[in-house]
Regions:
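Conserved S-adenosyl-L-methionine
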Residues: 1-73, 78-80, 89, 95, ...
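Conserved Class I SAM-dependent methyltransferase catalytic core
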Residues: 30-37, 52, 95-167
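Low-complexity, Lys/Gly-biased intrinsically disordered segments
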Residues: 74, 259-292
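Conserved nucleotide-binding/hydrolysis micro-motifs of P-loop NTPases
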Residues: 76-79, 121-124, 153-154, 170-173, ...
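Short hydrophobic/aromatic beta-strand or adjacent loop that forms the aromatic wall/cage
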Residues: 160-164, 192, 248
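Short, well-ordered beta-strand micro-motif
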Residues: 166-168, 182, 290
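Short, intrinsically disordered, charge-balanced linker/junction segments flanking boundaries
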Residues: 198-212, 247, 281, 285-292
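Non-catalytic DNA-recognition/assembly elements of restriction-modification systems
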Residues: 212-273
Length: 292
């Protein structure tokens, strides 16, 4: 669609292209109200025969054998009390809806399929068995990038910290690394009012993600302060498959043309009291010091 959109945001698809798009777009939702709203939205945008279905992907097998080239999803973050009672076709056994939804989408991509999925932080680092199994499956088969969003981007509806998982099954087979991107501001304040502000990282991060998907690792990415690239072996090292990018940042990475020097060679070190703590003796291992 982006390639067929003019400067004013109007879609310039031909009738045949629009018909092909309409025939290949599908949507599922468990809520009949959301299905009706989605159908009306499609009608208003000129799609006379939209394929939006009332369907529970977690407990029904009716459409299990349907696959997609591209999936975009913002699944529910919360599981109902008592958990989900899913069918037994999932590769990861869990009663947590956030685990099952991601599993479902990863399993229902075609061999060259791609997906963008918004997930709560539990998917990123929870240590439960199902979470680790899910992350292992994603790292080994489909995950190519993780975009960390600031807490509050969904205010006032939810203050949950979220990330976006980028899946690309074809690319995942060709590369042995995963890129992590950090968005600090999306152009709006993170309070309940979400007022527009000047700082907006999204255009830059979007460009970096595209470069990663098109070109792989290069100097600009490697040295960017909000990008971390980790090997799959590194992520799998302790069996946790943690998807927090900062965990893999090289603390010794030097983005400078100057040599490292010892602090004591260029400044007088004076151990002092700090934050109400007791006096720290200087033993060449002082972490917090004042310098002159």
């Amino acid at each position: 669609l982006q390639a067929s959109t003019d400067e004013r945001g109007n879609v310039t698809l031909t009738p045949d292209e629009r018909a092909s798009l309409a025939a290949n777009l599908k949507g599922y939702d468990i809520s009949p109200d959301m299905v009706r709203l989605s159908l009306v939205n499609m009608y208003l945008h000129g799609f006379s025969d939209p394929h939006i279905y009332e369907y529970d992907t977690l407990t029904s097998l009716e459409r299990w054998n349907e696959y997609a080239d591209v999936i975009l999803a913002n699944p529910p973050f919360m599981s109902p009390k008592g958990g989900i009672r899913p069918h037994n076709r999932f590769s990861v056994q869990s009663k947590r809806s956030e685990v099952l939804f991601v599993d479902y989408m990863a399993e229902h991509l075609t061999p060259a399929g791609r997906a963008g999925i918004i997930v709560p932080e539990g998917i990123i680092f929870q240590s439960g068995t199902a979470y680790k199994q899910l992350r292992k499956m994603l790292v080994e088969n489909a995950l190519v990038a993780v975009i960390s969003l600031p807490a509050g981007v969904f205010n006032p509806y939810s203050g949950v910290k979220t990330s976006i998982l980028i899946l690309d099954k074809a690319r995942a087979k060709k590369v042995d690394s995963i890129a992590f991107f950090k968005v600090e501001s999306d152009g709006f304040g993170l309070g309940a009012q979400r007022r527009e502000i000047e700082q907006n990282d999204l255009p830059e991060i979007l460009g970096l993600v595209r470069e990663w998907l098109d070109l792989g690792i290069h100097e600009k990415l490697a040295e960017h302060p909000r990008v971390v690239v980790a090997s799959k072996a590194q992520i799998a090292e302790n069996g946790e498959y943690n998807l927090s990018g900062e965990r893999y940042r090289n603390a010794e990475l030097r983005i400078t043309n100057y040599e490292w020097v010892k602090l004591g060679d260029i400044a007088l070190v004076k151990p002092q009291y700090g934050s109400g703590a007791s006096k720290v003796p200087y033993d060449n291992k002082v972490r917090y010091v004042r310098i002159t």
